[in-house]
């Protein structure tokens, strides 16, 4: 079986190569270059260090290694999506789009199709049910990345291998140390993948600029501060508002008037909601309604996430003529339109897919 391994130079993907070789595979190693650089060299991404470490791994295990450049595709499909989503006052998820469109999209179209399986360092697993592959959660609940993979499709999940998904992060580190891998002591990457060392707000300012507006207390209608543009703020945001007497939370945005509405939380109804609406929902393996597993006339008990945290929330999923509605068992803070709601089974093991949030209340 021919296997391609997507390697970043970090400890997780390095251990992937180590384990594949231990199991008798000789994977072809690929490093995807996606770091952004405009005409001014604005974006600083540590690609050279990544490539150097990946080269060492490839040499050690005698694996073929290729650097593939998807810079242009990444700009056109992921970075532009991020900027446009923010411009519309919504909350983007560029990491989710990167997996769907770049790592398992463009790469598959140009290189991956030559291989039987694609291995990555994601913390996730798969299960085979009724002859079909399902995305499943990882052993490590803190590192689990299924929410970032919840927009991929059946063709993509069917080819994927997650060699470290059944390990805790501490176990991955221990394997790397025992094997003497060059990335064993390397820190985990943080933040959005294309930004490198660049601050997110600096990036947004570069492409959307600044526009001063009012910060208004929702309950009283009083102007209590100024902001530099609604696009710098997301629903549920607590830090970076520059207000005293808090904590303050962003609860609404008036896009047309460039107004940020905030609350200190003494009225929980302004901050928390139980209803999530989605116009569409993308199943990874198969549509559970069409397959007959779920009945559109009944509520389906599920667990879900609306942000990258170890915790799952219970709820009931409904399918109607105009889309999908999720009723949460408990009130949740910061339901942000544009973000994705990721749906799991009741045991938060199988990940069914995700839908973009259009409204929360």
Curated annotation (Swiss-Prot):
Residues where ATP binds: 6-13, 32, 121
Site for Interaction with tRNA, residues: 122, 339
Keyword hit for Cell division: no
Subcellular compartments: Cytoplasm
Keyword field: ATP-binding, Cytoplasm, Disulfide bond, Nucleotide-binding, RNA-binding, Transferase, tRNA processing, tRNA-binding
Keyword Cell division: no
Reactions it catalyzes: S-sulfanyl-L-cysteinyl-[protein] + uridine(34) in tRNA + AH2 + ATP = 2-thiouridine(34) in tRNA + L-cysteinyl-[protein] + A + AMP + diphosphate + H(+)
EC numbers on record: 2.8.1.13
Region called Interaction with target base in tRNA, residue ranges: 93-95
Major place of residence: cytoplasm
Cysteine disulfide links: 98-193
GO CC annotation terms, alphabetical: cytoplasm
Main function: Catalyzes the 2-thiolation of uridine at the wobble position (U34) of tRNA, leading to the formation of s(2)U34.
Name of protein: tRNA-specific 2-thiouridylase MnmA
Organism annotation: Porphyromonas gingivalis (strain ATCC 33277 / DSM 20709 / CIP 103683 / JCM 12257 / NCTC 11834 / 2561)
């Amino acid at each position: 079986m021919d296997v391609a391994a997507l390697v970043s130079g970090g400890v997780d993907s390095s251990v992937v190569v180590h384990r594949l070789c231990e199991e008798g595979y000789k994977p072809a190693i690929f490093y995807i270059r996606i770091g952004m650089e405009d005409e001014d060299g604005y974006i600083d991404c540590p690609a050279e260090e990544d490539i150097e470490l990946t080269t060492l791994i490839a040499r050690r295990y005698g694996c073929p290694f290729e650097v593939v450049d998807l810079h242009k595709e990444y700009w056109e499909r992921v970075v532009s999506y991020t900027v446009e989503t923010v411009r519309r006052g919504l909350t983007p998820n560029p990491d989710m789009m990167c997996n769907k469109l770049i790592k398992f999209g463009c790469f598959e179209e140009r290189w991956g199709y030559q291989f039987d399986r694609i291995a990555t360092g994601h913390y996730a697993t798969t299960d085979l049910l009724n002859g079909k592959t399902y995305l499943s959660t990882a052993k490590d609940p803190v590192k689990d990345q299924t929410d970032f993979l919840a927009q991929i499709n059946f063709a993509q999940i069917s080819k994927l291998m997650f060699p470290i998904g059944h390990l805790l992060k501490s176990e991955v580190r221990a394997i790397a140390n025992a094997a003497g891998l060059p990335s064993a002591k390397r820190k985990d990457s943080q933040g959005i993948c294309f930004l490198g060392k660049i601050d997110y707000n600096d990036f947004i300012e570069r492409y959307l600029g600044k526009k001063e507006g009012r910060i208004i207390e929702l309950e009283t209608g009083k102007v209590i501060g100024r902001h530099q543009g609604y696009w710098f703020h997301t629903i549920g945001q607590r830090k970076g508002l520059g207000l005293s007497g808090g904590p303050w939370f962003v609860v609404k945005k008036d896009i047309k008037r460039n107004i940020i509405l905030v609350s200190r939380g003494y009225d929980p109804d302004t901050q928390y909601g139980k209803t999530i609406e989605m116009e569409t929902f993308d199943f990874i393996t198969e549509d559970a309604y069409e397959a007959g597993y779920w009945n559109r006339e009944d509520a389906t008990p599920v667990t879900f996430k609306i942000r990258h945290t170890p915790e799952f929330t219970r709820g009931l999923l409904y399918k109607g003529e105009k889309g999908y509605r999720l009723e949460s068992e408990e009130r949740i803070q910061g339901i942000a339109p544009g973000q994705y709601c990721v749906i799991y089974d009741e045991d938060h093991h199988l990940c069914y897919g995700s839908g973009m949030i259009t409204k929360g209340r």
